[in-house]
Regions:
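Flexible phosphate-sensing "switch/lid" loops adjacent to ATP/NTP-binding sites
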Residues: 1-245, 251-268, 275-276, 282-289, ...
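Cysteine-nucleophile active-site neighborhood
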Residues: 262, 268-336
């Protein structure tokens, strides 16, 4: 794999801060700071320097948001300039949505057409289109999109809903996305990779023999808040031939009275990280119940801290044990 660093994640805040710091140092010799060229140049510098510093063969840059948003305007201009400067060494791939109207049984390509027109209006012509859809798109639909969006037919790729995100690369390869990208960039097209290890991973994932139930004790209801933890558990399950069933348990509503009911049927508990006072007592309750009932428990960051505090309170006898973050005046500061 590739070891990523903070250089691999770029935010608007970091861009603006870098430009302001340069202005304060006098790098711009007193010139008026503007979105174009100063902000756009900083965006381009970061994208280019990533490839130059780490000697990557390809730099894949994802621009978040929706075309037409005010916030993304400087990034769109930077991408337009990059394409002009790099020529065939850069291509633009546009991800767009093709909704399916169930009541009418009809697929709508208008949102995609308008999205591409918005891109074209700022000087960007997509080289490849990825169409997100919940229903398989037949060739007439793909031809229509290619024609109206001025894109080669073999560069219109559909990304339909699949049981697992890990099946997407196989689906993309089967449609020739890798070949289309190499052709557009003028790179030699070699033998089609077998993706053997990836297919073996999918085989194990889809044919797990047993099931394990893991409870996530946390306080953030948004599913993506613990995305990396969920995926890590899923990966671990795959390599142990287990399907992992994950149950979210909100620590904010976890008490001594309901903890047995909430944690019932779990083979293991993971106490999640977080910030602030909200929900920490529920995590301590969960840690206590798991320890006294021999349930395998894994605490990450704040979760681990709550396990230490629970042990200090209930085993060492420090009833007021806490962390300095939660209580600066605690006489028994077990987490500093």
């Amino acid at each position: 794999g590739i070891q990523t660093t903070k250089a691999n994640s770029l935010t608007t805040g970091r861009i603006y801060k870098a430009v302001i710091d340069k202005e304060r140092r006098g790098d711009y010799l007193g010139k008026t700071i503007q979105v174009v060229p100063h902000i756009t140049d900083e965006i381009k510098r970061n994208v280019k320097s990533l490839g130059q510093k780490y000697h990557y063969d390809f730099v894949i840059t994802e621009i978040g948001g929706t075309i037409g948003d005010i916030e993304s305007a400087p990034f769109m201009e930077a991408i337009r300039q990059l394409k002009w400067e790099l020529g065939k060494n850069a291509i633009n791939i546009h991800l767009t949505y093709v909704p399916y109207l169930r009541a009418a049984g009809e697929l709508k390509t208008k949102p995609t057409q308008h999205s591409v027109k918005e891109l074209q209006s700022v000087g960007i012509q997509p080289d490849v289109l990825i169409l997100r859809t919940e229903k398989h798109l037949e060739e007439p639909v793909l031809k229509k999109v290619a024609s109206f969006c001025n894109v080669d037919l073999d560069c219109v790729i559909q990304s339909e809903d699949l049981p697992s995100i890990y099946e997407v690369p196989i689906n993309m390869q089967n449609q020739g996305l890798d070949t289309a990208i190499l052709r557009k960039m003028g790179e030699p097209i070699g033998e089609k990779p077998s993706l053997g290890p990836w297919r073996a991973f999918l085989e194990r994932r889809n044919n797990a023999k047993d099931t394990v139930n893991i409870g996530l004790v946390g306080k953030y209801d948004l599913q993506d808040a613990y995305k990396s933890i969920r995926e890590s558990l899923s990966h671990a399950g795959t390599y142990n031939d287990r399907k992992v069933n994950i149950t979210f348990i909100n620590s904010e509503y976890l008490t001594d009275d309901n903890v047995a009911e909430k944690l019932e049927g779990q083979d293991g508990i993971l106490i999640c990280p977080g910030f602030g006072q909200r929900g920490i007592e529920g995590k301590i309750v969960a840690a206590h119940y798991c320890r006294t009932h021999n349930i395998p428990t894994f605490g990450i960051c704040l979760g681990m801290q709550m396990m230490v505090i629970e042990f200090a309170r209930n085993v060492l006898g420090y009833a007021d044990a806490n962390s300095r973050e939660m209580d600066e005046k605690t006489p028994h500061n077990v987490i500093d």
